[in-house]
């Protein structure tokens, strides 16, 4: 029996039209989206299908939209996968989708949590503006050193998303992030790309959001996951509800340790493990191939993707 690891994408993967074809072809996907609409109290699925784009990309909408897409795919393929799930992992907000896949949280509850998460992150970003930038072609250790130097005046610049061996996202106060980017270029970075975000995610600037999110997480009806979920903050498997709550709150101010998470997932899966990315796009599949070059990975985002996968299963 093939060991399966589920992968769930994070913010940035949203686009107008997302999951529309899934809802039209698969009743399980439509039912998942309808249930999330009812829980949130507004037609998120309409925003996903038809836009407008500026509203869909707002943090408080983009986060539940991506989770809705991932969980709609899982509702279709999860029960039909021939293989034992050994782990799940999600990038940033995708960690919530991973807990849904592991049976620790209903999709509707997770959507409400990430909607709240997005609102709190947006608020924190308004109260203390921050920014993020992707550093390409430079080792993480060099990026971290540049951030330490840029932060020496008291402003914040940190390595926030450790996405690949030579792809790191930095986060913090705008001036410090700009300085860190310049220092990264001086150290040999190929490119530094500013990101269009509403705050300094995964940095200490998100502390007010993390504190309030912790309250919402404590009230959420978590169960122990049926299989381990690899936490962004530690890159270690989580097997109980209490630890899941704590680490999801910690996640807002901690780096996303994606390289280490994928290495740990590969260890849990063992030789021949199959990784399945569920949700919009295929970014995580691309990152995985750079981290674990011999990994077998499939991305399921569209109705055609899902249909082909089910035919071959």
Question: What residue spans do the PLM features occupy?
Answer:
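Alpha-helix C-cap/termination motif
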Residues: 25, 80, 149, 153, ...
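NAD(P)-dependent dehydrogenase/reductase Rossmann-like domain
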Residues: 176-177, 216, 255, 271, ...
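Small/polar (Gly/Ser/Thr/Ala-rich) solvent-exposed segments
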Residues: 265
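Polyanion-binding loop/helix "lid" in catalytic or ligand-binding cores
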Residues: 259
């Amino acid at each position: 029996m093939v060991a399966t690891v589920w992968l769930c994408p994070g913010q940035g993967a949203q686009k107008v039209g997302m999951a529309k074809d899934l809802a039209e072809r698969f009743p399980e996907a439509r039912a998942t989206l309808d249930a999330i609409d009812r829980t949130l109290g507004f037609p998120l699925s309409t925003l996903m299908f038809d836009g407008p784009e500026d509203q869909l990309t707002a943090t408080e909408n983009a986060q539940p939209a991506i989770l809705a897409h991932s969980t709609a795919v899982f509702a279709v393929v999860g029960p039909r996968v021939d293989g034992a799930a050994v782990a799940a992992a999600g990038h940033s907000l995708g960690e919530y989708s991973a807990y849904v896949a592991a049976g620790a949280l209903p999709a509707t509850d997770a959507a409400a949590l990430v909607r709240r998460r997005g609102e709190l992150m947006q608020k924190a970003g308004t109260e203390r503006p921050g920014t993020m930038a992707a550093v390409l072609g430079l080792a993480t250790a060099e990026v971290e050193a540049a951030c330490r130097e840029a932060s020496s005046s008291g402003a914040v610049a940190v390595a926030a998303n450790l996405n690949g061996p030579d792809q790191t996202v930095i986060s913090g106060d705008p001036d410090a992030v700009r300085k860190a980017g310049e220092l990264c270029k001086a150290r040999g970075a190929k490119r530094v790309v500013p990101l269009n975000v509403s705050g300094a995610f995964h940095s200490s600037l998100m502390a007010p959001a993390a504190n309030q999110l912790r309250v919402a997480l404590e009230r959420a009806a978590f169960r122990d996951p049926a299989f381990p979920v690899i936490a962004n903050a530690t890159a270690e498997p989580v097997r109980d509800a209490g630890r899941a709550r704590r680490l999801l709150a910690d996640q807002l101010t901690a780096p996303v340790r994606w390289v280490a998470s994928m290495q740990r997932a590969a260890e849990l899966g063992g030789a021949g493990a199959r990784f399945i990315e569920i949700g919009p796009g295929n970014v995580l599949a691309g990152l995985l191939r750079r981290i674990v070059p011999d990994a077998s990975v499939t991305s399921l985002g569209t109705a055609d993707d899902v249909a082909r996968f089910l035919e071959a299963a």
